Amino acid sequence: MRVLASHKHERTAQAIKEAVAAIISREVKDPRLGFVSVTKVDLARDLSQAKIYISVYGSEEDKKNSFIALNSAKGFIKGELASRVRLRIMPELYFVEDPSIEYGARIMEILEGLKKEAGENESES
């Protein structure tokens, strides 16, 4: 999937991101759906496909259940998206895990550990 860098293309991706985030948070009523956030949308050049990057806060089981819920609600989400964002062709939606927030949290944990370790070493000296 090649991403086109035009301004209109970026605005369309942003509109889809905002609409999908609102639909997931307000309209999807699946109990398997955990705390999720839409972090990014990549659109195919011809708008036939949209990769929707999702960050899930929680355990691996929470992630698995959230993606099952999203994939089972894909048709509903696409229908709601069609009523909110006017496009000639409604893209096929693909939900993809975005580990960047989790990765950032892990880096912060490591930095805090190093900071704590450095403080302990200074007090021993």
Swiss-Prot record:
GO MF: ribosomal small subunit binding
Presence of keyword Cytoplasm: yes
GO cellular component: cytosol
Keywords, sorted A to Z: Cytoplasm, Ribosome biogenesis
Cystine connections: none
One GO BP annotation of this record: maturation of SSU-rRNA
Assembly and oligomerization: Monomer. Binds 30S ribosomal subunits, but not 50S ribosomal subunits or 70S ribosomes.
Entry function: One of several proteins that assist in the late maturation steps of the functional core of the 30S ribosomal subunit. Associates with free 30S ribosomal subunits (but not with 30S subunits that are part of 70S ribosomes or polysomes). Required for efficient processing of 16S rRNA. May interact with the 5'-terminal helix region of 16S rRNA.
Protein name (Swiss-Prot/TrEMBL): Ribosome-binding factor A
Annotated organism of origin: Carboxydothermus hydrogenoformans (strain ATCC BAA-161 / DSM 6008 / Z-2901)
Chain's gene name: rbfA
